[in-house]
């Protein structure tokens, strides 16, 4: 009798152990037919896997924080090897840089470290694929890829959307002008000046309220 009881017990234990160890239902449980172990609410590890058709592929990634959510729409593909290691606010996530759209409206989904960095969808407002916001900037501040647009005498380049784009003659910000830090007002900025042609001097300003003044032969602050 004791032998029979031992056999029955071993069979039951083997059946429980042979069950599926990890569930794919995003409940936070590791489940077997006879055992359910509750992990910390919201914190779970996922097996990275790529799903969906070619143009909407997305990857479920390994998460270490519940604030890393999986984007389910087009062109919002978290990287398979991307993990959020800090205790971030809900919605903070990292994206895989991808360039999309026709030649004149190309834009790039960039690596984001905060949810305030949104993707510009218009002409000439292309975030750089390697551009990351490293400081604590107010909502909406971001860096753009410099692009020169317009006919020859009205060419202009955008570097940040809060720096207004001048639309007149000879008011062209330089393509190498970037905002590198948050400056409190328009008086604290660095200027790069150079002369172009016999009559006109162009300059580049960095900082809040960057305005470009253009006069014959001279350009003043």
UniProtKB/Swiss-Prot annotation:
<keyword id="KW-0732">Signal</keyword>
<dbReference type="GO" id="GO:0005576">
    <property type="term" value="C:extracellular region"/>
</dbReference>
<keyword id="KW-0165">Cleavage on pair of basic residues</keyword>
<feature type="compositionally biased region" description="Low complexity">
    <location>
        <begin position="48"/>
        <end position="69"/>
    </location>
</feature>
<feature type="compositionally biased region" description="Polar residues">
    <location>
        <begin position="70"/>
        <end position="85"/>
    </location>
</feature>
<feature type="signal peptide">
    <location>
        <begin position="1"/>
        <end position="19"/>
    </location>
</feature>
<feature type="propeptide">
    <location>
        <begin position="191"/>
        <end position="221"/>
    </location>
</feature>
<feature type="compositionally biased region" description="Polar residues">
    <location>
        <begin position="25"/>
        <end position="34"/>
    </location>
</feature>
<feature type="region of interest" description="Disordered">
    <location>
        <begin position="21"/>
        <end position="155"/>
    </location>
</feature>
<feature type="propeptide">
    <location>
        <begin position="20"/>
        <end position="45"/>
    </location>
</feature>
<keyword id="KW-0964">Secreted</keyword>
<feature type="compositionally biased region" description="Polar residues">
    <location>
        <begin position="123"/>
        <end position="133"/>
    </location>
</feature>
<protein>
    <recommendedName>
        <fullName>Immunoregulatory peptides</fullName>
    </recommendedName>
</protein>
